[in-house]
């Protein structure tokens, strides 16, 4: 991570590659103009990639074990170009109910009107996924773990079943996985049979909550379709954002390991608090998904869910949130700062919903001193009960 994506042709002597603000690129000869690499490894036109995006893609590919990667303008654009690359009118896509809600709504509200059949499935469907696959299925979309509820797919099982059923039907099904929570530091999906990994690099890659960025990591078979989808839709990542993403990667391991440690301590403390019904965090030994997490991941993200002991009214929640000293309220996560927000299940969620009837919170552990974070939570939960 420290030295990937630092080719001399990009750096020109600088330690970090300066942002290249350019749309038009000048060729030195007709031969150079005619002969540039058609897999877009060269700097030929701003929308096709800059030295900053090329370096970021190179570094991420090395870290994730990908053949090539594609940098995009956000995590949602990464999902868009991937889905659009493999789905056409009349095709069927299976989407986990545990997906990031804007991703699920992208499938239902954007792709479905174009004639794509969208079907959701429980994140713990297991062998039951075989019955959902049909000749028109072209994509299976996973997220590990689930957003909000943090179930863990049995990825090995799902991949095996999809491949077997696809072979029986004589079809080609692309398996896509959103790997934002663990990142390539703690999980490498392509090594587990996944075809395409999508990453909201806005989160841990950038790491400082100051840039929007997405990355799609591809196998050799999936790369050209994904890259073409980005080109046809005019989706690319800016040089400044790629600069910040590449800079963030240099310290990502140190940040994520410390945040993981903080999250584990916070999860353990919350699990013993009387105001908390359940902590949704697979790395914790008390999680019902701990064994699957241990089988799949080498570490964990610092995002978790919290189910409180009852449904709290708005004024009580205001007592909790409005006076937190370290935990801030804000969308997104993955930066150095700790965040705490009230949340709810996805609009399309239908499985196990009764388990989440009480007030549901989402917590992101940052880099602050963990004792200070726990003290902030202790005071906040006391205010919640007193309100």
Task: State what each model feature region is.
Residues 3-10, 68-275, 280, 291:
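Conserved PLP-enzyme active-site core in the AAT-like
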Residues 6-8, 21-27, 181-183, 203, ...:
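Glycine-rich beta-alpha junction loops
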Residues 24-77, 103-109:
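Conserved N-terminal alpha-helix of the aminotransferase class I/II PLP-enzyme fold
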Residues 26-30, 223-224, 311-315, 347-348, ...:
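Short, acidic Gly/Pro/Ser/Thr-rich loop/turn segments
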Residues 278-361, 365:
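Conserved C-terminal alpha-helix-loop-beta "cap" of PLP-dependent enzymes
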């Amino acid at each position: 991570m420290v030295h990937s994506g630092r080719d001399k042709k990009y750096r020109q002597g600088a330690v970090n590659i300066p942002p290249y603000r350019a749309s038009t690129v000048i060729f030195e000869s007709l031969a150079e103009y005619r002969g540039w690499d058609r897999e877009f490894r060269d700097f030929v036109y701003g929308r096709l990639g800059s030295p900053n995006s090329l370096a970021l893609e190179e570094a991420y590919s090395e870290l994730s074990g990908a053949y090539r990667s594609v940098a995009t303008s956000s995590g949602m654009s990464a999902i868009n170009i991937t889905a659009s690359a493999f789905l056409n009118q009349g095709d069927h896509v299976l989407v986990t109910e545990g997906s990031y809600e804007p991703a699920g709504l992208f499938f239902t509200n954007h792709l479905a009107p174009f004639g794509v059949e969208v079907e959701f499935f429980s994140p713990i469907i297991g062998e039951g996924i075989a019955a959902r696959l049909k000749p028109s299925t072209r994509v299976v979309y996973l997220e590990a773990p689930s957003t909000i509820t943090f179930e863990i797919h049995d990825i090995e099982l799902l991949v095996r079943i999809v491949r077997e059923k696809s072979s029986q039907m004589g079809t080609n099904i692309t398996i896509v996985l959103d790997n934002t929570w663990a990142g390539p530091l703690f999980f490498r999906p392509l090594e587990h049979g996944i075809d395409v990994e999508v990453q909201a690099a806005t989160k841990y890659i950038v790491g400082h909550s100051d840039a929007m960025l997405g990355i799609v990591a591809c196998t050799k078979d999936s790369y050209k379709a994904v890259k073409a989808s980005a080109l046809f839709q005019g989706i690319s990542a800016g040089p400044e954002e790629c600069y910040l993403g590449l800079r963030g990667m240099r310290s990502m391991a140190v940040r994520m390991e410390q945040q993981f440690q903080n999250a584990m301590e916070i999860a353990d403390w919350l699990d013993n608090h009387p105001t908390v019904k359940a902590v949704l965090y697979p790395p914790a030994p008390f999680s019902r998904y701990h064994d699957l997490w241990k089988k799949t991941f080498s570490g964990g993200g610092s995002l978790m869910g919290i189910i409180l002991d009852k449904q709290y009214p708005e004024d009580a929640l205001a007592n909790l949130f409005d006076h937190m000293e370290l935990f801030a309220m804000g969308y997104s996560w993955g930066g150095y700062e700790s965040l705490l927000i009230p949340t709810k299940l996805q609009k399309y969620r239908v499985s196990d919903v009764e388990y989440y009837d009480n007030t549901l919170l989402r917590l992101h552990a940052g880099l602050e001193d963990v004792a200070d974070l726990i003290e902030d939570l202790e005071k906040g939960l006391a205010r919640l009960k007193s309100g």
